[in-house]
């Protein structure tokens, strides 16, 4: 506080205090108009504006908002419009809805989440509660970027952000942003297995694959290798040495865990390095993920691996 001529702090001085904005408030301000409220049978969820083509706007939200038909969408400006459901994905709990607008809307800028580091600050944003007019915002750090988690009913392993920030029901389907206001994930509504004290969001990289499938086909088909993998390029020299991997190796994905298989076919093993699938080079887990979205459960894929220092090919039946 500043003092007046008498040496005492004045009420006027206190009322004139200037509060500065932070990286968090700047990111929220930048992204606010790209988050919407999705209203379904008196319940409120969130959605993100993923794309705009002329007057057609595509919004991703939670399947909870679409289970009883087409929900209403309320933009941050307060404009309410009806929507059409394009498709939904029961595995991830993500749905795609479409609205028509005659006003300007702003889709999110999407970050390549392979660049997101452990310990990065993130903000989870909801649409506005239509009763109170307020929006829920919570902040935290990414405990694990790109962690693989299985939901409670299938063997599909989703690429997730594990975060230490609390999440409420209205934030389901909402945005996870970095401090530049870019989308890094969408809040998951499925019961993914993991640390019960953590919350999860589907990475923006996988969200793009889900969106493209829903937009094109109205549904998502995918196969699963049934393994948890890690980019070889992310492994430190001592980790490579411990696993017998050439320290100069920069591409491929390392098999960390094998999920119980239910189909016949050759098995991947812990310690395998996947270098190619169907003749396509696998430089990172994102390549593996994208390849799985081109297949369905029951398909057989040809997988090139390095096992025990030797190269070999195996046929894997996808789950």
Range-by-range predicted roles:
Residues 111-134:
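Short glycine/Trp-rich loop-beta-loop segment that forms part of the substrate-binding cleft
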Residues 1-4, 84-86, 98-99, 180, ...:
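C-terminal recognition in membrane/secretory proteostasis and scaffolding
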Residues 21-25, 35-59, 80-82, 107, ...:
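A conserved glycine-rich beta-strand in the N-terminal activation segment of trypsin-fold
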């Amino acid at each position: 506080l500043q003092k007046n001529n008498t040496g005492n702090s004045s009420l006027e001085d206190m009322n004139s205090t200037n509060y500065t904005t932070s990286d968090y408030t700047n990111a929220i301000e930048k992204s606010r108009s790209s988050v919407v409220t999705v209203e379904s049978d008196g319940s409120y969820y969130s959605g993100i504006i993923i794309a705009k083509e002329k007057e057609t706007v595509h919004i991703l939200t939670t399947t909870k908002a679409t289970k009883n038909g087409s929900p209403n969408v309320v933009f941050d400006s307060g404009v309410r419009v009806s929507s059409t459901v394009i498709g939904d994905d029961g595995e991830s709990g993500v749905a795609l809805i479409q609205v028509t607008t005659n006003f300007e809307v702003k889709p999110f800028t999407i970050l390549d989440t392979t660049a997101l580091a452990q310990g990065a600050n993130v903000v989870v944003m909801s649409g506005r509660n239509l009763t109170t007019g307020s929006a829920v915002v919570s902040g935290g750090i990414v405990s694990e970027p790109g962690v693989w988690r299985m939901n409670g009913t299938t063997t599909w392993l989703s690429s997730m952000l594990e975060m230490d920030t609390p999440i409420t029901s209205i934030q389901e389907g909402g945005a996870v942003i970095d401090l530049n206001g870019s989308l890094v994930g969408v809040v998951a509504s499925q019961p993914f297995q993991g640390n019960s004290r953590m919350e999860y969001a589907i990475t923006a990289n996988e969200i793009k694959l889900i969106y493209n499938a829903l937009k094109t086909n109205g549904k998502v088909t995918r196969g699963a290798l049934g393994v948890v993998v890690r980019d070889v390029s992310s492994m430190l020299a001592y980790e490579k040495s411990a696993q017998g991997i050439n320290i100069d190796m920069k591409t491929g994905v390392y098999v960390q865990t094998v999920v119980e298989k239910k189909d016949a076919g050759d098995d991947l093993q812990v310690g395998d390095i996947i270098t190619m699938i169907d003749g396509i080079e696998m430089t990172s887990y994102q390549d593996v993920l994208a390849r799985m979205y081109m297949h369905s459960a029951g398909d057989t894929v040809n997988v090139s691996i390095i096992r025990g220092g030797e190269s070999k090919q195996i046929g894997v039946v996808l789950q």
